[in-house]
Amino acid sequence: MTLLALGINHKTAPVSLRERVSFSPDKLDQALDSLLAQPMVQAGVVLSTCNRTELYLSVEERDDLQEALIRWLCDYHNLNEDDLRNSLYWHQDNDAVSHLMRVASGLDSLVLGEPQILGQVKKAFADSQKGHMKASELERMFQKSFSVAKRVRTETDIGASAVSVAFAACTLARQIFESLSTVTVLLVGAGETIELVARHLREHKVQKMIIANRTRERAQILADEVGAEVIALSDIDERLREADIIISSTASPLPIIGKGMVERALKSRRNQPMLLVDIAVPRDVEPEVGKLANAYLYSVDDLQSIISHNLAQRKAAAVEAETIVAQEASEFMAWLRAQSASETIRDYRSQAEQVRDELTAKALAALEQGGDAQTIMQDLAWKLTNRLIHAPTKSLQQAARDGDNERLNILRDSLGLE
């Protein structure tokens, strides 16, 4: 059994590739079923966010393992293997464990130390448990990563400063508009990122917020909290002209805001500028919108410079966090190896007990038939000794024939021979 982590993220692939490799929430079960149908995959978790798509797997070793998994990923998303191969990373065993711990702790995020990723990892794990999780090793790896992420946040200052994609989006808005108290903001979506954006905007006393979402009920809960108006996604075309700032983050597989829609809104606004911040993957706003005069479009990749400005105080904490992760990953792999040894020990003991029970039963039967006790006991001892040392003897003989002194020494040590 081997633990794997493979995927792409904001550091290895642009948004144009990440959106093609992402898994939509409504098709996640189908993707997991397809993944687990691969003969080498024992268990799997799919993590798909705006900044990364990753597969965490428990697999059986085989020579073409990497090629088979890349082929599955490309076939599933209808991608050319060459397009994906150069952006794909691949981690195995200790490196896979360390990678997941870093991801869950926010050490591999676009925003160093951001807490939202832990919730996303937990959700990915929970989704995988709906009939998909089969290997205790993978499950244990995730559970351990959750506790490591908590330890990192508790023992370091990695989360001391409030920087996130949501915070960066609001920072961008405040840089472009002198005061948010005079602007109207349209938020598209009502997920965790938009919730954070809405709370940031409320703190900066934005004049008006409108929330457009597929399901009104979820949006209404957020709207009640931040004092916003709720509209349907179908109303965006009509209401877009009111918005000075549009911040969008949905799980829609297709753009929600198109170039024509923005053109009409700008015309109604007499070309007053609009800021559009698209933090969704796949993108919610057609890229062509950025070519329009007075429409200022920023994608999640464009937020990098803003985010980088806020990272200085987290870098020292990240060094401490990396030390914790390295220690915890090493301890987890030691535990995993111990589990493997425990299984071998159980099998060996069970085998010895079967031999003991079999030969003891024969000896007792011979005694009941009136056989000589001393002869029967000597025969039992002789047969028991021969049966128990047979396999080690064969291994020692084979190692000697092969000239494998290292194996001979290991066997001598295992048998307690000086």
Swiss-Prot record:
Alphabetical UniProt keywords: NADP, Oxidoreductase, Porphyrin biosynthesis
Entry-linked PROSITE patterns: GLUTR
One Pfam assignment: Shikimate_DH
Pathway where it operates: Porphyrin-containing compound metabolism; protoporphyrin-IX biosynthesis; 5-aminolevulinate from L-glutamyl-tRNA(Glu): step 1/2
Protein name, entry field: Glutamyl-tRNA reductase
HAMAP family recorded: Glu_tRNA_reductase
GO molecular function list: glutamyl-tRNA reductase activity; NADP binding
InterPro entries in UniProt: 4pyrrol_synth_GluRdtase, 4pyrrol_synth_GluRdtase_dimer, 4pyrrol_synth_GluRdtase_N, GluRdtase_CS, GluRdtase_dimer_dom_sf, GluRdtase_N_sf, NAD(P)-bd_dom_sf, Shikm_DH/Glu-tRNA_Rdtase
Catalytic activity: (S)-4-amino-5-oxopentanoate + tRNA(Glu) + NADP(+) = L-glutamyl-tRNA(Glu) + NADPH + H(+)
Comment field on protein domains: Possesses an unusual extended V-shaped dimeric structure with each monomer consisting of three distinct domains arranged along a curved 'spinal' alpha-helix. The N-terminal catalytic domain specifically recognizes the glutamate moiety of the substrate. The second domain is the NADPH-binding domain, and the third C-terminal domain is responsible for dimerization.
Role description: Catalyzes the NADPH-dependent reduction of glutamyl-tRNA(Glu) to glutamate 1-semialdehyde (GSA).
Annotated site location: Important for activity: H99
SUBUNIT field: Homodimer.
Entry binding sites for NADP(+): G189, A190, G191, E192, T193, I194
Family in the record: Belongs to the glutamyl-tRNA reductase family.
Example GO biological process: protoporphyrinogen IX biosynthetic process from glutamate
Active-site annotation: C50
Native source species: Escherichia coli O6:K15:H31 (strain 536 / UPEC)
EC numbers for this chain: 1.2.1.70
